[in-house]
């Protein structure tokens, strides 16, 4: 699997530093983007609903309650798409977001990092528009594989980062709005935020999972806005090997 090995060799990555002008407005931009306070971010949230619906689709079809873990849960927007679970845990580096969310009662535990989770197994691990941000993505995916219960699945949605349609999409919406508001080039912020392309994410998923299925919002992966992956049958030897090499 030379292509997968080549992709894995590019990790861990180093996130590009933001220039001072971007750091000065980053927190406010992040808040407005999260809350959909601008026309562009509001439109983006409507488009992202496709990912939320795909990720949650299996939960509505389950006949028994499930144990679910969400990676990068933010302020718990995704739980609006999920039926009640037996257990719903989340991982969020900005722990104050889920803790202060009006939907906090829907979850059991909130962790800052996935490494805090011990002695747990989940039927479902879900994530929406998060994996493109992780500088050490293979470690996160390997840990997810080890946390899955027998017959479990990981379901993730990602933007089609690295494709022309995705570039045109944000360039004509958020990019134009960002330049009008701040006089700055949005691509600098995107390079800081999105360190992984959709192709790289797919490569990592296929390395650690034997059964990976994909759907796209678009004509094909190379001409799409978003992608959804359903991952089953983790290769436990490969997943564990990531952590054995770091000991």
Task: Tell where the protein language model's regions lie, with residue ranges.
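S-adenosyl-L-methionine-dependent methyltransferase catalytic module, highlighting the catalytic core
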Residues: 2-28, 32-45, 49, 114, ...
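Conserved SAM-binding loop
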Residues: 53-166, 228-236
């Amino acid at each position: 699997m030379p292509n997968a090995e080549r992709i894995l060799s590019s990790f861990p990555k180093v996130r590009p530093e933001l220039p001072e002008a971007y750091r000065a407005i980053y927190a406010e931009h992040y808040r407005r983007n999260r809350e959909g306070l601008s026309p562009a971010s509001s439109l983006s949230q409507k488009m992202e609903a496709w990912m939320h619906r795909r990720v949650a689709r299996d939960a509505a079809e389950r006949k028994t309650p499930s144990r679910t873990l969400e990676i990068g849960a933010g302020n718990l927007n995704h739980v609006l798409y999920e039926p009640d679970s037996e257990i719903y845990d989340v991982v969020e580096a900005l722990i104050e977001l889920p803790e202060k969310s009006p939907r906090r009662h829907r979850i059991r535990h909130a962790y800052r990092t996935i490494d805090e989770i011990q002695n747990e197994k989940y039927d479902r691990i879900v994530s929406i528009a998060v994996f493109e941000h992780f500088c050490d993505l293979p470690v996160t995916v390997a840990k997810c594989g080890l946390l899955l219960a027998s017959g479990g699945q990981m379901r993730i949605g990602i933007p089609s980062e690295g494709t022309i349609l995705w570039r045109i999409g944000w360039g004509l919406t958020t990019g134009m709005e960002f330049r009008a508001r701040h006089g700055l080039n949005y691509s600098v912020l995107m390079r800081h935020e999105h360190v992984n392309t959709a192709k790289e994410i797919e490569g990592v998923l296929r390395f650690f999972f034997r059964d990976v299925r994909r759907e796209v919002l678009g004509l094909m992966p190379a001409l799409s806005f978003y992608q959804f992956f359903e991952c089953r049958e983790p290769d436990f030897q490969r997943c564990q090997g990531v952590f054995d090499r770091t000991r």
